[in-house]
Regions:
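Peripheral, non-catalytic segments flanking oxidoreductase cores
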Residues: 1-231
């Protein structure tokens, strides 16, 4: 994998949490990015979920719109093509996507802020598989926040109470074929409004990083690596 930032193994966190946390922190301070290998995310589950969404995004538009609720502001379920406009942009991105979030008990008070996930009954195991993958990413994010806390000289569990039942989302993005005459970008230069984001590689290269040190740099060849960045 060619990247300007380091690729570090999550196995090293168990061996020496201080050294792992220091290297993670150095990369975040310099680049805002770090690659994580041996991350524990089930790669077979990732492929299953990718296949599930291939089936979904190939559905006719009128079928996909059954799973779009404009009142949710894109918080859960389907968001159609050319709806989301990035921060500081004046044209919507040429993409469609699906959001999966945290599942809560029916009596949980946090339900007033977190809507239910949306199921697609026609796709077998849709909700089970997507929820399972969300939880794996959620656990990885929590562990990396422990490392960030250690790097900052805090107790490893410092962020636990802040992220407990946090309103995180797993976003699956599809960039449909476009005409050259269409205005807008797939996903132009932007900053995400997040604490920590985890990105898996798609089937085509696309991620580029803008840094003060090296200008625009493309990250390529990262099938087995999860890119972690801070927003």
């Amino acid at each position: 994998m060619h990247t300007p930032f380091s690729i570090i193994s999550l196995n090293d966190f168990d061996k020496d949490s201080s050294s792992f946390s220091e290297e993670l922190g150095i990369n975040f301070r310099k680049w805002g990015f770090c690659g994580i290998k041996d991350h524990g995310i089930d790669t077979e589950l990732v492929k299953e979920v990718q296949d599930i969404f291939k089936d979904f995004f190939n559905l006719p538009e009128e079928d996909k719109l059954h799973f779009f609720n404009p009142d949710l502001g894109g918080a859960r379920g389907y968001t159609p093509f050319k709806i989301e406009t990035p921060k500081d942009a004046n044209k919507p991105d040429l993409k469609e996507f699906w959001h999966v979030g945290r599942e809560l008990d029916s009596i949980d008070p946090f339900r007033q802020w977190m809507p239910d996930n949306i199921d697609i009954p026609s796709i077998p195991n849709f909700k089970h598989k997507t929820n399972e993958l969300f939880l794996q990413f959620d656990q990885l994010g929590s562990l990396l926040l422990q490392a960030i806390a250690i790097h900052l000289g805090l107790e490893g569990g410092y962020f636990d109470s802040h992220i407990n039942k946090g309103n995180s989302v797993m976003r699956v993005i599809h960039y449909p074929p476009i005409e050259l005459t269409q205005e807008g970008e797939r996903a132009g230069a932007h900053q995400d409004i997040v604490s920590v984001a985890l990105v898996i590689g798609g089937q085509q290269a696309g991620l580029a990083i803008l840094s003060q040190q090296a200008g625009g740099v493309r990250a390529t060849g990262w099938e087995d690596v999860i890119i972690c960045y801070i927003g």
